Amino acid sequence: MDSIISAASVIAAGLSVGLAAIGPGIGQGNAAGQAVEGIARQPEAENKIRGTLLLSLAFMEALTIYGLVVALSLLFANPFTS
């Protein structure tokens, strides 16, 4: 029974990293595209747009890091195994 729990934990860890990266990846692509459009329309606002973009990208990347933390806790600090 312990091997089934270990196998399920490995699968869940892989899914948590994969699914946690999908949303922020799409969001980062959209945000970068909109930032490039905004800079193309108003080149004088480049510094303000870039600063806002970098801050929002950091928040989006935090979601992926949370998925990595969940995966690492499932692999190395699993409460379901003895």
Swiss-Prot record:
Site (Reversibly protonated during proton transport): 61
Localization terms from the record: Plastid, Chloroplast thylakoid membrane
Record has Ion transport as a keyword: yes
Keywords: ATP synthesis, CF(0), Chloroplast, Hydrogen ion transport, Ion transport, Lipid-binding, Membrane, Plastid, Thylakoid, Transmembrane, Transmembrane helix, Transport
Transmembrane segments: 4-24, 57-77
Domain of life: Eukaryota
Cellular component, GO annotation: chloroplast thylakoid membrane; proton-transporting ATP synthase complex; proton-transporting two-sector ATPase complex, proton-transporting domain
UniProt KW GTP-binding keyword: no
Subunit composition and interactions: F-type ATPases have 2 components, F(1) - the catalytic core - and F(0) - the membrane proton channel. F(1) has five subunits: alpha(3), beta(3), gamma(1), delta(1), epsilon(1). F(0) has four main subunits: a(1), b(1), b'(1) and c(10-14). The alpha and beta chains form an alternating ring which encloses part of the gamma chain. F(1) is attached to F(0) by a central stalk formed by the gamma and epsilon chains, while a peripheral stalk is formed by the delta, b and b' chains.
Family: Belongs to the ATPase C chain family.
Additional remarks: In plastids the F-type ATPase is also known as CF(1)CF(0).
HAMAP family: ATP_synth_c_bact
Protein known as: ATP synthase subunit c, chloroplastic
The gene coding this protein: atpH
